[in-house]
Amino acid sequence: VLHSGRPAQDFVHTIPGYQGKCAAWLDVPLQDGKEKFLKPGYERRAEAISIAKEVKRIADSCGPSLSIGVISFYRAQCDLILDALADEGLAEEEDGEIRIARSYRQTESGDERLRVGTVDAFQGKEFDVVFLSVVRANDVVVPDQKEGEERERLLNGKYGHLRLANRMNVAMSRQRKLLVAVGAKHMAEGPESEEGVPALAAFLKLCREEMAHGR
């Protein structure tokens, strides 16, 4: 079960498209493209593009008063997201690296406005809105008859770093107002996900409950 530990009024906001919500799932279905394995990690281009477009929309709608963080469990995905943000004008090349564009680096109060990084880069930090790039998107099936170490191996193969409970906890607790998971929704559906990635499955359930209550 997911608990924020903070009062509901802390999450009140008027972010366009998410009014009244503290949790949302932006579905990027499997047919938009599977995960791609790159030693030592994974990336998914369709997710990176979706995130960049949504970050651009929200950043420009809400202006420099709103801070946004984009988290992935994979460094390769962070690099893809930065490239996609560059395509949207939110990042630029500087000293041979892609970095957040100067005009998007600070909020009007002087805080960091936009950050992209792995979970480690978000330790101890909070942003008004956080996008979590799920990355893992596959059609791997874990047969019911598989048990013990073999079952764990198959679940690890399907979900990867999403199974690291401590990192998932950090990733899901960096937002002040809104957390948006971006990825293939089916990866958080069904008994397999409840066993393999319980926090992600619970988050999708929360998103659906908010939708059902008209929030």
Residue positions per predicted region:
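Conserved nucleotide-binding/hydrolysis micro-motifs of P-loop NTPases
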Residues: 75-78, 121-123, 136-140, 177, ...
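Amphipathic alpha-helical transducer elements in NTP-driven molecular machines
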Residues: 48-52, 78, 116, 161-172
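Hydrophobic/aromatic beta-strand patches that form the interior of the parallel beta-sheet core
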Residues: 24-26, 117, 131, 180-182
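Structural motif
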Residues: 71, 131-133, 172, 180
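Conserved helicase/translocase motor-coupling segment
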Residues: 3-86, 97
